Amino acid sequence: MLESVGISRIITLDIHSEQIQGFFSFPVDNIYNSNIMSKAVSDKYNVDDLQVVSPDTGGVLRARSVAKTLGVQDLAIIDKRRERANESEVLNIIGDIDGKVCIVPDDMIDTAGTLSNASHALKDKGAKEVIAFITHPVLSGNAIENINSSAIDKLIVSNSIDIGDKSKKCPKIDVFDISPICLLYTSPSPRDVVPS
């Protein structure tokens, strides 16, 4: 169906499930925005002070990619149980986070309940700071209240979803402009331009 209207390639930004790429008969490129957002901390911290933490087992590839971008050798993983949507319980943290600035990359944040629980668990286990990189800030329901009362020190979100004045209600939120990334990946390269 998409081919019938001239679409020959799709570019996604932190796709929620990479398996979706296999459902198309043409290339689907996924850009890990959290790698680009990692520049927001790479100049502020010594790499030895950082620990990248996957918020769950499903986010390990994203976290490993961010760790590689930052030059962080090890990875920590939050083992959690999810009873229902927007509710989770941290069972264990696998990896060394004591005294570390923990970077938690994820594709989206909805009510912030899961990230709030994770931030408290990380601080309880000795994390010095918790910084989250989130590509798609849904921020529904009581998300702002959850973030404000969480142990998150900084929440860096992209502007893939306009959050309006929510960042004014939460001093922990920094918005990262992704328009240069979108321009880079959507501008035709010289080989794609048809001479007139």
Region roles according to the model:
Residues 1-5, 31-50, 179-187:
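Hydrophobic alpha-helical segments within soluble ligand-binding/sensing domains
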Residues 4, 42-43, 48-168:
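PRPP/pyrophosphate-binding module of the type I phosphoribosyltransferase fold
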Residues 10, 28-30, 52, 75-77, ...:
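Conserved beta-strand scaffold positions in the cores of enzyme catalytic domains, especially
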Residues 18-40, 145, 149-154, 160, ...:
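Short acidic, glycine/proline-enriched helix-loop-strand junctions
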Residues 27, 55, 188-190:
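Proline-rich low-complexity regions
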Residues 185-196:
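Single conserved hydrophobic/aromatic residue that forms the stacking wall/gate
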